[in-house]
Design a protein with these regions (language model features):
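Gly/Ala-rich beta-loop-alpha elbow adjacent to hydrolase catalytic centers
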Residues: 98-102, 106
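Catalytic histidine-centered segment of alpha/beta-hydrolase-like enzymes
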Residues: 173-183
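Active-site nucleophile loop of the alpha/beta-hydrolase fold
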Residues: 58, 120-128, 151
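Short beta-strand/loop motif that positions the catalytic acidic residue
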Residues: 142, 148-150
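Serine-hydrolase catalytic machinery in alpha/beta-hydrolase-like enzymes
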Residues: 2-93, 105
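Catalytic active-site module of serine/aspartate enzymes centered on a nucleophile-bearing elbow/loop
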Residues: 181-212, 216, 228, 232
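Conserved alpha/beta-hydrolase "acid-adjacent" motif
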Residues: 155-160
Length: 232
C-alpha cells in the first residue's frame, strides 16, 4: 500500500490479522530494504503473536536515495506513516522498530507516536571508528521499553543497557546480524508476548532485567511488567 507524506510517498507491506492484539511497524536501514533477514525474522515473530505487521519503505528510499537526509524530515514522515497505519487498527497498541537507521527513527519518534515499545535491531551507536559521536541519547529518547539486538562484532558499536533499555549481544556476527534469523525470531517473540499479553517466559542467561544486558541469543528477553552500506 502507498502512504502519502509531506516528504513524498512511502509504501508498506502489510500482513493484517482479523483482530490483532497489536500493530508492529518495522522499517529498513539507511540504504537497505525491508526484506533483510533480521526484519523478516521480526515480522515472523509478530505474526506468531497474531499481530498486524507493516514493513515500511520510507519516502527517500522509494525515490531511490540511499541516504535519509534530514533526521527531522525523516521523523516527520515516519509519524505521518504510523498515524495512517494506526487508523486501520484503532485502539490497538503500537510497537515500532527497525534495523540500523530505522531503529534510530523508531527511538526518536516513539513518544510522539505513542508507541508501547521499540525494537532496535543493529542499533548504530556511533559511526565506525568514531565512538565519540555516540547516539545513545536517541535510545533514551524513546521513553519506553526498548529491546536492542546487536552483533558483538558490529563496527557501529554496541549500546549499554540502562533503565528500560535491554541489550542482547549476539556473538559471532556484525552489523548485518547474518545467520541470526532464528535467534531473533525467538528473542523478539518472547519479548512481544510479555509486552502484550504478560506471558512469563523462562529466565534468560544472565537474568536479563531492566537496565541489563546479556550475550548470546537466550530463550527470552523479559521486559519490566506494565506496559556496508548501511549508514546508520
Amino acid at each position: 500500500m502507498k502512504i502519502r507524506t509531506a516528504a513524498g510517498p512511502a509504501s508498506a507491506e502489510l500482513d493484517a490479522a482479523a483482530d490483532p492484539p497489536f500493530l508492529l511497524v518495522l522499517t529498513h536501514g539507511a540504504g537497505g530494504g525491508t526484506d533483510s533477514a533480521d526484519l523478516m525474522a521480526a515480522r515472523q515473530a509478530g505474526l506468531d503473536q497474531g499481530a498486524a505487521v507493516a514493513r515500511v519503505v520510507q519516502p527517500y528510499r522509494l525515490r531511490g536515495a540511499r541516504a535519509p537526509g534530514s533526521a527531522a524530515r525523516q521523523d516527520e514522515a515516519w509519524l505521518e506513516i504510523v498515524a495512517k497505519l494506526r487508523r486501520r487498527f484503532p485502539g490497538v497498541p503500537l510497537i515500532q522498530g527497525g534495523r540500523s537507521n530505522g531503529a534510530r527513527v523508531a527511538c526518536r519518534t516513539a513518544r510522539a507516536a505513542g508507541a508501547l515499545a521499540v525494537l532496535a535491531l543493529a542499533f548504530p551507536l556511533h559511526p565506525p571508528g568514531r565512538p565519540e559521536r555516540s547516539r545513545a541519547a536517541e535510545l533514551a529518547q524513546a521513553g519506553t521499553e526498548v529491546l536492542v539486538v546487536n552483533g558483538a562484532a558490529d563496527p557501529f558499536g554496541v549500546p549499554e543497557a540502562a533503565g528500560a533499555i535491554r541489550v542482547v549481544v549476539l556473538p559471532g556476527t556484525a552489523h548485518a546480524l547474518a545467520g541470526q534469523g532464528g535467534a531473533i525470531r525467538r528473542l523478539v517473540g518472547s519479548w512481544l508476548a510479555l509486552l502484550v499479553r504478560g506471558d512469563d517466559p523462562p529466565e534468560p542467561p544472565g537474568g536479563l532485567r531492566p537496565g541489563s544486558s546479556v550475550t548470546g541469543p537466550g530463550p527470552s528477553v523479559p521486559p519490566s511488567r506494565g506496559v556496508g552500506r548501511d549508514l546508520g
